[in-house]
């Protein structure tokens, strides 16, 4: 039985990835930062084929633990970087775990025989740290795809900057190591929407959907989104997981980084759809998904279907 290691495999996106690999007959090893916190991963135990699931404690800043985690894996998915918007200390909360964690991970996989494929869950921020606003030099209606120049700004949110630098680190590693025995590919989802598999309320993605659904602004950043009726390119969490699974099992994608996106809607229309009401405007296509459709044979769900089905679990 082939084994996949999924760093961040119990999170919002990671849970769906774990399900995809279990459903397809893989042994799955999922990381947990604190294995005593069973509430973080207990929802995975109800999945089909959960007898092939293993949970292993891991801190990505611990090189020894990382080397041990990847040591018996055929495929490794790295989605274990923090997604925090209300950040107090960007260096310790975002930059260190994201960038140092990526550097440590690259060192671990380079020194581990037997790995066949590595997939990084990057972010639209790996392409444009201004998201959901346009990249520098582009208008609100200009499209963006993998042929466009990557854009970053020191004024962007620390989360976006950290993801951009981490992706640059991966690209440099690929360039500096032309004779790797395994392939490395990345996916860069836009705003990820959908239902959480767990009953936890600590996911930033589901939390943002809850805020938009109820038009709550806990800080100036969120309030500005409402005030400017900002538009978001959106993708369903199930589609992100499917794209990651397909990327992991498909040969010949070394060095590719796929934008994962469906349609773009204004935040006011997102609010309507999250409340099962029809949007006022038709969707736009800003972040293009042609490459993922071509290479991965992906079809992306309409955003309306995804937002209409959103459920936020409250105790």
List PLM regions with ranges.
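Glycine/proline-rich active-site loop of Rossmann-fold NAD(P)-dependent oxidoreductases
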Residues: 179-182, 194-210, 246-257
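N-terminal Rossmann NAD(P)H-binding glycine-rich loop of SDR-like oxidoreductase domains
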Residues: 4-26
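Amphipathic terminal alpha-helices
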Residues: 290-293, 301-315
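NAD(P)H-binding glycine-rich loop region in Rossmannoid oxidoreductase-like domains
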Residues: 35-100
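Mid/C-terminal beta-alpha module of Rossmann-like enzyme folds, strongest
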Residues: 229-231, 241-289, 310-311
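Substrate-positioning beta->alpha
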Residues: 203-208, 221-246
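Active-site Tyr-X1-5-Lys
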Residues: 152-184
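Conserved Rossmann-fold NAD(P)-dependent oxidoreductase catalytic core, especially the SDR/UDP-sugar
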Residues: 88, 93-154
């Amino acid at each position: 039985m082939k084994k996949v290691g999924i760093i961040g495999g119990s999170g919002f996106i990671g849970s769906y990835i774990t399900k995809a690999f279990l459903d397809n007959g893989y042994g799955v090893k999922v990381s947990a930062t604190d294995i005593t916190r069973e509430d973080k991963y207990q929802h995975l135990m109800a999945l089909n084929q959960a007898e092939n699931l293993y949970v292993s404690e891991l801190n990505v800043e611990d090189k020894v633990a990382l080397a041990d985690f990847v040591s018996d894996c055929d495929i490794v998915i790295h989605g274990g970087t923090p997604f925090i918007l209300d950040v107090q200390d960007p260096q310790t909360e975002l930059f260190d775990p994201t960038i140092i964690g990526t550097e440590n991970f690259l060192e671990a996989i380079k020194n581990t025989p037997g790995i066949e494929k590595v997939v990084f869950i990057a972010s639209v921020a790996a392409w444009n740290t201004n998201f959901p606003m346009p990249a520098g030099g582009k208008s609100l209606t200009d499209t963006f795809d993998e042929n466009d120049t990557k854009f970053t700004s020191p004024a962007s949110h620390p989360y976006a900057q950290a993801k951009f630098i981490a992706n640059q680190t991966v690209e440099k590693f690929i360039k500096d190591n032309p004779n790797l025995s395994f392939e490395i590919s990345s996916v860069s989802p836009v705003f990820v929407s959908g239902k959480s598999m767990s009953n936890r309320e600590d996911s930033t993605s589901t939390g943002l959907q809850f805020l938009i659904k109820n038009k709550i602004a806990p800080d100036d950043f969120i309030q500005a989104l409402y005030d400017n009726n900002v538009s978001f390119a959106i993708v369903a969490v199930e589609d992100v997981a499917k794209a990651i699974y397909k990327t992991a099992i498909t040969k010949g994608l070394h060095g590719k980084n796929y934008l994962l996106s469906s349609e773009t809607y204004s935040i006011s229309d997102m609010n309507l759809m999250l409340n099962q009401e029809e949007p006022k405007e038709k969707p736009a296509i800003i972040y293009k998904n042609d490459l993922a459709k071509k290479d991965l044979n992906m079809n992306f769900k309409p955003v309306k279907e995804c937002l209409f089905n959103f459920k936020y679990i409250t105790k």
